[in-house]
């Protein structure tokens, strides 16, 4: 398989050729332009100074401004082809923006008496090259990078000293990323062919439909429908973000270094076999990244009213089990503050009810072993945002501790849509070996016009880090580290304008 995905330039050339080779094509008829501007802000309530030795970090406040333009080509084939069920469409779109306010630039580290450094690049502008080949990407963002056998040779005092030292090095590394941001991305650049409702193939850059690879995909996917069966293949050789909170140019989330030192992009791939019958859906599927992980999984869902359109009653049940197996080189390492191990499992059970314009439900999410550090955190079927921690958590990202090894989460939600107003409530309790979390959030959204809408979320978020564990350290337990209780409460706002 050719791992090199067509560039945006090649896609644009193809679109031009298709649209210009026949007089039957009228650009005004086949092309539709979309454009808009959006803004996102997060307001954190914990503004205490940083102390890297104690593992104490504030909750960031930042604001973005974004704009995009997209050209959609609805049909690129002549009527003689479409009459026989053949269709070809495509899209080309670009997104750009910037952080216009960022409190992380001013947070002081009490250990050094100096600013820790800007961290908003973690949301907007992160860039180290497709496979992390850029010079600044070789520094250590993560702490606790030794193996268990190496830690076994160290005393507790030595590990504590190492955790303090690496936290300062991570700060220096973060500053180099802040100096090399890339605040734009060609997020859409694809062609899609389908034949009736039987076969479809799409390649290029497009928003990922994969449950466990969110964002935008650089790769391809294929669908084959045969009666009650659906077969779906997905390949990703790059992941990007083009949203008002997140803006990343494409990077490979899974890489492998050859013996000669060259880093390659083996991609992330998935294959689903889906059987649908009278509301039931049984989905055995596998995700894998060569040299990294192999995950045989399954999902079973039941929908009592698949044609639900907002009137009447609907019940939806979702049971998903993930079973990641890791490459041998990871077995002795620490990931998300816990040993990776050979393999792990996770279980999600989610129940949702809808009655006219209202919805409510509940669920559980349980990890057995370190199940999420490869597959679970790049995307999930949970249906809510679990990236609302501080940007300093887990060594420089805002991932919730509900993704930790052996963590157990119970959650409940409810909401409704009333003409132009929508609202939602979410409560979550997480119990884990590293941290407990209590979350309660209220979301409100209003569509003022067909072109303008706004949303706001209020979230109470308390995080209790257990004794022996320190934020910013992903290595073994530190006996001298006391428990810490840190406030992660915040407000999200979103403003969206579409042309």
Question: Language-model segments: what does each one mean?
Answer:
Residues 2-11:
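Bacterial N-terminal signal peptides that target proteins for export
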Residues 15-201, 223-224, 419, 425, ...:
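Beta-barrel outer-membrane channel/assembly domains of diderm bacteria
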Residues 364-447:
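C-terminal structural cap/anchor segments
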Residues 67-75, 189-193, 220-224, 270-277, ...:
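Residues on the lipid-exposed face of transmembrane beta-strands in outer-membrane beta-barrel proteins
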Residues 61-67, 182-187, 214-218, 225, ...:
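Residues that define the transmembrane beta-barrel architecture of outer-membrane proteins
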Residues 112-274, 283-290, 384-403:
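Surface-exposed coil loops of outer-membrane beta-barrel proteins
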Residues 37-45, 94-100, 205-209, 226-228, ...:
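Transmembrane beta-strands of outer-membrane beta-barrel pores
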Residues 232-297, 303-386, 390, 456-493:
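Outer-membrane beta-barrel translocator/channel fold
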């Amino acid at each position: 398989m050719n791992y090199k995905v067509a560039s945006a330039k090649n896609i644009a050339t193809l679109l031009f050729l298709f649209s210009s080779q026949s007089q039957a094509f009228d650009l005004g008829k086949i092309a539709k332009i979309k454009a808009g501007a959006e803004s996102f802000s997060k307001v954190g309530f914990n503004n205490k100074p940083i102390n890297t030795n104690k593992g104490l970090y504030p909750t960031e406040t930042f604001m973005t401004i974004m704009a995009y333009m997209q050209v959609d080509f609805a049909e690129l084939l002549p009527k003689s082809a479409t009459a026989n069920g053949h269709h070809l469409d495509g899209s080309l779109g670009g997104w750009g923006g910037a952080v216009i306010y960022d409190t992380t630039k001013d947070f002081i580290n009490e250990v050094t008496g100096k600013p820790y450094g800007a961290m908003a690049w973690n949301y907007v502008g992160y860039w180290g090259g497709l496979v992390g080949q850029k010079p600044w990407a070789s520094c250590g963002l993560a702490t606790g990078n030794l193996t268990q056998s190496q830690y076994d040779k160290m005393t507790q005092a030595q590990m504590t000293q190492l955790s303090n030292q690496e936290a300062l090095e991570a700060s220096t590394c973060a500053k180099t990323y802040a100096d090399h941001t890339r605040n734009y991305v060609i997020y859409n650049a694809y062609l899609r062919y389908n034949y009736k409702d039987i076969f479809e193939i799409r390649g290029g850059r497009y928003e990922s439909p994969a449950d466990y690879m969110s964002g935008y995909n650089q790769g391809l996917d294929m669908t084959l429908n045969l009666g009650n069966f659906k077969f779906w293949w997905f390949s990703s050789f790059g992941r990007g973000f083009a949203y008002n909170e997140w803006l990343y140019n494409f990077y490979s989330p899974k890489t492998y270094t050859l013996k000669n030192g060259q880093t390659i992009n083996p991609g992330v791939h998935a294959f689903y076999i889906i059987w649908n019958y009278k509301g039931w859906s049984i989905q055995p599927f596998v995700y894998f990244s060569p040299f990294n992980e192999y995950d045989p999984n399954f999902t079973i869902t039941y929908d009592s009213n698949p044609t639900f359109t907002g009137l009447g009653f609907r019940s939806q049940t979702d049971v998903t089990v993930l079973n990641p197996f890791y490459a041998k080189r990871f077995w002795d390492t620490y990931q998300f503050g816990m040993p990776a191990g050979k393999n792990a499992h996770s279980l999600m059970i989610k129940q949702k009810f809808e009655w006219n314009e209202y919805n409510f439900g509940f669920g559980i999410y349980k990890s057995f072993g370190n199940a999420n550090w490869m597959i679970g955190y790049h995307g999930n079927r949970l249906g809510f945002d679990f990236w609302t921690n501080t940007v300093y958590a887990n060594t420089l990202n805002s991932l919730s501790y509900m993704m930790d090894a052996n963590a157990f989460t119970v959650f409940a939600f409810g909401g409704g849509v009333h003409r132009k107003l929508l609202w939602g409530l979410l409560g979550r309790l997480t119990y884990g070996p590293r941290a407990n979390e209590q979350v309660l959030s209220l979301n409100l959204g209003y569509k003022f016009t067909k072109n303008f809408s706004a949303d706001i979320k209020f979230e109470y978020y308390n995080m209790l880090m257990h004794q022996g564990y320190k934020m910013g350290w992903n290595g073994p337990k530190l006996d001298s580290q006391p428990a810490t209780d840190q406030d992660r409460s915040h407000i999200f706002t979103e403003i969206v304008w579409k042309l």
